[in-house]
Amino acid sequence: MKMRRWMVWLLTGLLPLMNGCAGFWDAESSSSSSLTTTTLSSGYFFVLNIETNQIISYYVASGTLTKVASYTTPTTPITLAVAPNNSFLYLGTVGGIYVYSISSGKLTIANSGGVISSDEAYTMQVTPNNAWLIEAVSGTANVMAIPLSTSTGLPTGSEQSPSSGLPSSAIQQLAVSPNGDYVFVAMGSGGTAYIPFTSGNSNPFGSVTTISTYSTSGAALSVAVDPDERLLYIGETAATSSSNSGGLRVFKFSSFSELSGSPYATGGLAPYSILPEAGGSYVYVANRQTASSTTGLIEGYTITSSSSTYALSSMASNFTAGIHTVALAEDSSDQFVFAVNIGGSYDLNAYVFDSTNAGYLDKVIQSSTGSDPVEAGAIAAIH
């Protein structure tokens, strides 16, 4: 089933949220007066322009966004992922999954330019040991694992899946735990599946368990795991009682029991991306829009713990992004947070951590990633 992101939003009932009052997208300010100056530099990262069939490779050099190269994808792209060893980039398209080798931010297509799987992966991630590519196709009630060679990035055998499949085909996003022992799949109104994963087994998947949505009218859009495997995060719609009803649900990883105080308000309608900060002190949620604006909003939370009891507190300020923000990434230096936006003229925003207010994000870059509309729909960074 060939399915673009717009089609998935239609099927999950999310596209009606995207209407704007003026020309579909709200207007963006062209002023850069709100930008903070920085001299910091980042690692390499890759932005996927879905509408223009491009992967753009970037890094930040002393505060300046620097383009490495632009690559035309073999067919209409959907998503991408970088392997933890930073040697390979995997590209999901309507024609299947391709693999590229990475060298100093430059890409070279591998496997003689052919696909390594015919699956139209909507979401994917490589396991921490680089041995499996986990991927799922929206519209198919399953999640797949492709065994990989850690030296070539190519498949070494047939793909595997849970014996029972998944209880829902409304696939939104997947995540692999940092230790590689669980796979999580956000399945829209079908809730979130968690599956034990044993890399050394011929079929690494265990039995599927489902966490239902907080509200019967809600949908699980995003999922992520704390870098130290303390907490599991799920972003859902219709999870709070405010007009901006998006919620961040938080579970203790060891028991998958929900924290007191969860769900936490995200300040927007559709929590499309969750970014646990690499140091483990903060977590950020990108809302694609709010009840009053198509401008994306990033909500930040501070994580506290006492005797293995965890709590989150919202930062006093939130952080604006671009039009319909859909994905976040942290760079390999742990100094930058990047956001991509599918609408408007600023396809990419970059932030650094504020030097005074712990965890706050200061916007330092706002830029197009091509001749708009490009639909910058995914981002992946070198680890």
Task: Give a label for each model feature.
Residues L11-Y44:
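Bacterial Sec-dependent N-terminal signal peptides
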Residues T39-S41, V82-N86, V126-N129, V176-G180, ...:
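Residue-level detector of Asp-centered blade-edge/turn motifs that repeat once per structural unit
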Residues E51-N53, G96-I97, G139-N142, S189-G191, ...:
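Short glycine/acidic-enriched loop and turn motifs that connect beta-strands
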Residues S57-T64, Y100-L107, A145-L154, Y194-F205, ...:
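Short loop/turn segments immediately following beta-strands, especially the blade-tip
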Residues T64-T72, T108-I116, G157-G165, G206-S215, ...:
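A short beta-strand motif characteristic of beta-propeller blades
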Residues T76-A81, D119-V126, S168-A175, G218-A224, ...:
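Repeated scaffold domains used in trafficking and secretory/extracellular systems
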Residues I342-V352, A358-H383:
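Blade-level signature of beta-propeller repeat domains, shared across WD40, Kelch, NHL, RCC1
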